[in-house]
C-alpha cells in the first residue's frame, strides 16, 4: 500500500510543480500589459501551489486521528525522514499554511472579480497588500503549528495504546504527533484549516451568483467581446473553485477518522493524498482559459526551448478562450459602470 501512495504523491506533486512553475513563468513574462495587475493574483496562486506540491513530495504524510480523542499521530514517509524530524514538522506546518492560503486567495479572486464590475482595476501594489493581509492568518499558523509536535519517544508509547492493531515500532518513517489538541496553538491551527473552508465556499458561490446577475444587468452596455471575456473568466474561476473541493474531501476524511466512524489505513493515507490534487490541477484553469498563456503553452509544446529564450510580453492585449474568438481582457478589467 505504501508503494502505491508513494507513487501517487510523487506523480501528482511533480506534475503540480511543473504546471505551477510554467504558470508563474507565463504570468511574469508573458502577461499582456492589460492584465499585469491581475497577474499578481495568478502569480500568488502559482507560487502557493508550487510550494504546496513540493512539500507534499517532501513529506508524503499519513495521518492517524485518534477516534473520539484530542490527539493526532503523523507518519512522514517522504525524503524529509532522511533529513530529520524537525524538517518534517516544519514542512507540514508550511504545507498546511499553503493549503489555507489557497482557499483565502480564491475568495480574494472572486471578491476582486466582483469589485471590478463596479470600479477600475486596482494597482499591483494594492493587490499585493491585499494578498499580504489575507496571508497573515496562514503565516501565524505556519510559524506556530510545528512547535506543538511531540517527539517519537513521547508519541510512540501512546500510539501503541491508541492503535494496538498497527506495528508502529516497525515504521521507518518519522513518527510524531500532537498529544493535546485542546491547547491554543492546536485549536487555532486545526480550526483555521478545517472551519473556514465551507463558509468561504458558500461566500464564493454567493459572489459568483452576484457576478452573473451583474453581467445580466450590464449586458446591454457591454460589447459582445467584453461579455464573452467576462463569461470565460467567470468559467475559469468557477472551475478553479471546484478544484479545491478535493481539500473539502480531505477535511471530510479527517472528520470521519477523528470521529471513529471509519477506521482504515487507506483513509489515513488518503487524507493528504486527496489534498494534493487541488494544487496540482489548479493551474490548468489559467493555462487554458487565458488565451495568451494557452497560446504560449502550445508554442512551448512545439518548441520547448524557444519560449524560454524569449521573455518579452509581446502584445498589450490579453484575451480569454471564447469559443474560438478573441476577447479583449483590457475591457474585462475596466468594465463600464
UniProtKB/Swiss-Prot annotation:
GO terms for cellular component: membrane. It comes from the Eukaryota. The keyword NAD does not apply. It is a multi-pass membrane protein. Keywords: Membrane, Transmembrane, Transmembrane helix. The keyword Transmembrane applies. It comes from Caenorhabditis elegans. Gene3D superfamilies: Rhodopsin 7-helix transmembrane proteins. Belongs to the nematode receptor-like protein srd family. This is Serpentine receptor class delta-18. The chain crosses the membrane at residues 2-22, 90-110, 130-150, 187-207, 236-256, 270-290. InterPro entries: 7TM_GPCR_serpentine_rcpt_Srd, Nematode_rcpt-like_delta. It is found in: Membrane.
Amino acid at each position: 500500500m505504501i508503494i502505491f501512495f508513494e507513487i501517487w504523491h510523487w506523480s501528482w506533486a511533480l506534475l503540480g510543480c511543473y504546471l505551477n512553475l510554467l504558470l508563474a513563468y507565463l504570468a511574469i513574462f508573458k502577461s499582456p500589459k492589460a492584465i499585469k495587475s491581475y497577474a499578481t493574483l495568478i502569480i500568488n496562486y502559482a507560487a502557493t501551489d508550487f510550494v504546496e506540491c513540493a512539500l507534499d513530495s517532501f513529506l508524503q504524510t499519513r495521518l492517524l486521528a485518534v477516534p473520539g480523542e484530542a490527539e493526532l499521530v503523523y507518519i512522514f514517509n517522504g525524503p524529509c525522514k532522511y533529513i530529520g524530524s524537525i524538517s518534517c514538522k516544519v514542512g507540514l506546518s508550511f504545507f498546511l499554511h499553503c493549503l489555507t492560503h489557497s482557499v483565502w486567495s480564491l475568495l480574494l479572486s472572486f471578491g476582486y472579480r466582483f469589485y471590478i464590475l463596479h470600479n477600475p482595476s486596482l494597482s499591483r501594489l494594492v493587490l499585493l497588500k491585499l494578498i499580504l493581509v489575507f496571508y497573515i492568518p496562514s503565516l501565524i499558523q505556519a510559524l506556530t503549528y510545528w512547535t506543538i509536535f511531540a517527539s517519537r519517544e513521547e508519541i510512540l508509547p501512546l500510539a501503541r495504546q491508541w492503535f494496538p492493531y498497527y506495528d508502529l515500532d516497525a515504521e521507518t518513517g518519522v513518527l510524531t504527533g500532537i498529544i493535546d489538541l485542546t491547547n491554543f496553538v492546536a485549536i487555532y491551527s486545526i480550526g483555521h484549516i478545517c472551519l473556514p473552508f465551507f463558509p468561504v465556499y458558500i461566500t464564493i458561490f454567493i459572489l459568483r451568483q452576484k457576478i452573473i446577475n451583474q453581467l445580466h444587468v450590464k449586458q446591454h452596455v457591454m460589447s459582445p467581446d467584453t461579455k464573452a471575456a467576462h463569461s470565460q473568466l467567470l468559467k475559469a474561476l468557477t472551475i478553479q473553485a471546484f478544484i479545491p473541493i478535493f481539500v473539502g474531501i480531505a477535511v471530510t476524511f479527517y472528520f470521519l477518522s477523528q470521529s471513529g466512524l471509519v477506521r482504515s489505513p487507506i483513509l489515513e493515507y488518503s487524507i493528504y493524498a486527496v489534498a494534493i490534487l487541488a494544487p496540482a490541477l489548479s493551474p490548468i484553469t489559467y493555462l487554458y482559459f487565458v488565451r495568451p498563456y494557452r497560446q504560449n503553452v502550445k508554442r512551448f509544446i512545439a518548441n520547448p526551448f524557444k519560449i524560454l529564450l524569449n521573455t518579452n510580453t509581446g502584445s498589450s492585449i490579453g484575451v480569454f478562450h471564447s469559443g474560438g474568438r478573441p476577447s479583449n481582457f483590457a475591457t474585462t478589467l475596466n468594465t463600464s459602470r
